[in-house]
Structure formats: C-alpha cells, structure tokens
Amino acid sequence: MSNSIAVIKIGGNVIDDNVKLTAFLQDFSKLKGPKILVHGGGKKSSQFSKEIGLTPTMHQGRRITDAATLDVVTMVYAGLINKNIVAQLQSLGCNALGMSGADGNAIQSVKRNHPEIDFGFVGDVEKVNTDFIQTQLSQGITPVFCAITHNKKGQLLNTNADTIASEVAASLSNAFEVVLHYCFEKKGVLQSVEDD
C-alpha cells in the first residue's frame, strides 16, 4: 500500500450538477494509490424535505436537524447520493464502498452542545476508527463517506462533511502522508462567507 493518501471532500456544487459529478468521479477514479471520498448532501435533502412538507431550518449555514429531518438526510445522504456515487465509481473500475460513520463504527460523534442554539440531531466528530478504515484501504477498497455519523448508543447524527473529511485525514496522518482536498464553490478558505 502507498504511503500517501488523498482525502477529498465534495460539496453541493459538484453533487447537484450531474455533468460536474460525472467529470469529477472520472478524475477521482484515475487517482493512483489509496483514496477516500467524503460527500455532503447538496440541495437534494432540502428539496426532499420540502416535497414532504418539512421546512429546512439553517443557522449560519448549518442545518438544524429534528427527528423528521434526520430521517430525510439519512435517506438522501447515506442512500440516494452515496449509492449513486458508489455505482458510478464501480462503473469506472474504482472499488468503492459507500458508508456512513455508523458502518464498521467508522466515525463516532457526540451530539452538538451549543450554548444558544439547539441543533437537534447534529454531531461533532469524537473518534475515527482508523483500524477499520485502514483495513478497507489495504483490501483495495475506496471508502466513500456520507455526512451521517453515530454516537455508539444507537443514535444517528447529521455531521458536517467538511469536518468528517478533516477528522478522517487527521486520524490517518500517523500512517500516511495525507493530502486533503476540498472541492467547493467558494474561492478558497474564507474567514467569512461575505468575503467571497
């Protein structure tokens, strides 16, 4: 196994555009060596929420996740989006395995405890199961993580995909030279979204 690894996170600008997603996955599948893909949910979860009569609620760009919203984001992120990405990667010869953080106890989180806002079922990453991930990588499998984690007490949690990517990358840094890439619509890492 190579001593370097790419961890790449894609956001809504890629996920919501089939042409961009296909082009990205073609390039991603050609990357040599071990790699991990992390994805968010784009606009699809908000779209599905509205279709079933739920109004998405955001606070500073973060989704407030009540029980009904958690059901939707789990279905969309871990189901529809994740499995479509995995199927496309398989068609390109990339042996991808789609997962949430609950699968293989890959990523554990704690429910966000904010002093002013109740984010509901939103998680902050607490632990990454590096052994499990390295086992997948050693078998030639490319993990594809969605933005759902768990608390190891039976509760799924909606978790920021950017954070998942950075925590997975950091957890692997003792075993690999990690290169972390974020593919998003902003011009770079900004101190404020108004700086764009």
Please identify what each model-predicted range represents.
Residues 1-196:
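Nucleotide/pyrophosphate-binding catalytic subdomain
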